[in-house]
Amino acid sequence: MNISFKNILHTLLLWCITLTLGAQAPPAKQANDNAFNSVSYRPLTPLKVNGEQGVSAPFAGSIYQNLIVAGGCNFPDVPAAKGGTKRFYADIYELPHPDKNPNGQWHKIGELPKALAYGASVTVPQGIVCIGGTPDGKNSCAEVYLLHTDAHHKLQTTPLPALPLALDNMTGAYGGGYIYVAGGLHNGETVNVAFRLRYPHGKTWERLPDFPGRPRVQPASAVQNNATASCFYLVGGFAPANKTERALAHTDGWCFNSATHQWTKMADIIPHGQTEPMTLAGAIGITSGCAHIVFVGGVNKQVFEDAVNRPLLIEQTENNLKLAPTSTLQQQLDQLNKEKAAYMNHPETWYRFNNELVIYHTITDTWVTESQSPLLARAGAAFIQCGHEWIIVNGETQPGIRSSAVTGVKMDMRPTFGWINWTVLIAYLVGMVLLGYYFMRREGDAEDFFKGGGRIPWWAAGISIYATMLSAITYMAYPAKAYATDWTYYPMLVTILIVSFPVIKYYLPFFRRLNVTSAYEYLERRFNATTRLMASGLFIVFMVARMALVLYLPSLALTAVTGIDLYICIVLMALVTIVYCTMGGVEAVVWGDVVQGFILVGGALFAVGYLIWGTEGGLQGFWQIGTEYNKFRLFDWSFDYRSATFWVIILGGMANNLISYTSDQTVIQRYLTTKDEAGARHSILLNGFMSVFVSIVFFAIGAGLFTFFKTHPAELDFTMSKGDTIFPFFMMSQLPQGLAGLLIAAIFAATMSTISSNINSVATAFSVDFYKRFCPQATNQQTLRVARSTCIIAGVLGMGIALLMATWEILSLLDFFQEILGLLSSGLGGLFLMGIFFPRIGGKSALVGFVCGVCMVFLTRYLTDTSFLLYGFIGMFTSVAVAWVCSFFLKEEKNLKGLCWKTIQH
């Protein structure tokens, strides 16, 4: 069968164009309807504490997936409307996991140390932490204890550090390694306090800055990530009336940033598309996904404020009547007294308790409502997280009336990929495999497999370098980073062009003129065999780790938009990539990169246009919103070495890119595929300019994602578990079928270009640096077989680590990748730097410096707060400095002709 490269390329492009032109628009959505999320409700076994009543304001949580409710209060004998007395309980009830025991019943399993209600409770891995509360509605408690079970599954109570201030009617939340409490009453007096306890190792509660504004009683809260850190969000609640101010149901919220230790104001609770603010007094906050908080229940602002302010109005009217009695004032007083008497006797619907899910997004600072249900209309209810289901327990449906209802609420995503998208994606994958098959048939020997026979044009090599270094990390994580923060990472990409000039002048001549196949051959000639083997081995470890990450990213995207299991996606992607790159060698990899590069850039340009066009106000809205929220900020001029400030970005970017472009076999191998040194120079410069100018598109995508979802917050996936999936989510939720499939194929292109290059470079490093060195008599065909076997092994190892990585909590995959780069590769850059520019440094000194540099990076990582962006610079500087000092004590004589910059010039 005669398969030509042009036929493969033309067929692939024809498939994409034809299917894209036949794209189908996504289904129309009603106003404020999210077609990506579905909400379901189910009634569970009621909890009846006294007669038909439940309780309000209990402690609640789960222990070994069983539901636990403790304490609470109600009016058991005479209703509150008739002057009944509130009773507080100490009883602890348990319900077996609803899915494992659908017919399970609540049963009493013990008692609290005393009757309590209106405290805060959070579920931790060890059990349920119960905080504060009141035994009588007057006196506050400071006790904190852990409800848990012993080895015999018997309920136990273990004291924890007490609150510095006794509190009740406050709120509490757990996350980021801390338990937070804020607001409430101290023996009847409202307070603005906030505390946190490091759990489980904290010995005392830390006093946080008081939150701004008036105090809050019965606010809601949650711990959730914002763009950069874990934060405590305090929302709603009410401020009781005092001598100078009326009672106020708060419609705002405040965010405590755990990194900056400061409170910042949240947007007022005005859901998108509405004009009237809401309150969340008596509501509960639930963390959803990686950046959403769902609030359930709570009172109606107008009805509640009228009720709590009515006694004050009556008093004021009575005083006015005494001073100047009029019939109008008397009528007002009569009406107020009538309303007061009738307040407790209306039907449930009159009170208008919140019956919607009120959802806040921490990145865009927006509110939406979703899914009305009468089952949600409760205040003072308890919340229990049970797997992916939210259990809402009891609470009151109107003042004084406690519900016994227990409701399960589940929010799921309903992704659909569609046959057109699948066809586009499969056509692309098949085309790449055919490309590999074509070049496998052209291959002659190991030299072709490793260097492509020197037949690669300089422009193709340049595009290949760009596509290889781009990867899915750039295609997904850079837009996600710009969407969540700003453009402060962009100058790092400019340093690629800056680094290109010293690479061309000082490094390229060594790799081309010494005619090496592996970059680490130079290290043996310059230093010794140990240095070469150690460097090559470390490179292989780094490449396998990198393969795992760039395998994980697109699999994450495919899972987010199709619903296919993440682990299946990883395995599928790995197998396709292994087959493709094992067959065709570096020539297939390079030409595959060229095709993939056009798909990547074309897809990105289209996405930018669509995002700007879809933002309310178009280009003007895009610019205004982006400017207002500092989405285009390029520089942080502070001198904080712990964050992405300008000098950290520049210093770290220069070091990390110098490491990649001077010691990474994946890149250096491209220098060796061109016909001559001039072609290699041109390819490096082309990559540098593409990195500067094309990367603007990816940051514009990030800003566009922010402006689009800022103006369409109801279109977000409220359950999105990884922030890096925001771009592929946009593709699938907003773009027509076919176009979406093509952009998803672009993510696969980014992945395959990087993975195939990594696998090929690992095979080169192992075959040349280890196999051929220890088996010098091996033939070219034997070396080729070893190289292909290494491709398979390396790919499988990368796949295994990617499967493990899927279980980790990583806030930003871009940050994680840069951290791995600094930890594992800084020493390699140092070796090439000292080899070329420091002729007095010998092999022994280089090894000592290398080890010290790696150790310094790990010490910096685990003992300081230094930004991960500086790890590469720290490691490289330390290794060179230590090696240079050691060279005065460990002197070595060696002929360095042609092996360092001084001698190669001659």
Model-derived features: positions:
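Kelch-like beta-propeller repeat domains
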Residues: 13, 26-416
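Generic recognition of cysteine residues
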Residues: 16, 73, 130, 141, ...
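A short, amphipathic alpha-helical segment
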Residues: 2, 407-411, 631
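Bacterial N-terminal signal peptides that target proteins for export
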Residues: 1-12
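Membrane-embedded helix-loop-helix hairpins and adjacent transmembrane boundary segments
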Residues: 414-906
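Hydrophobic h-region of N-terminal signal peptides that target proteins for export
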Residues: 13-22
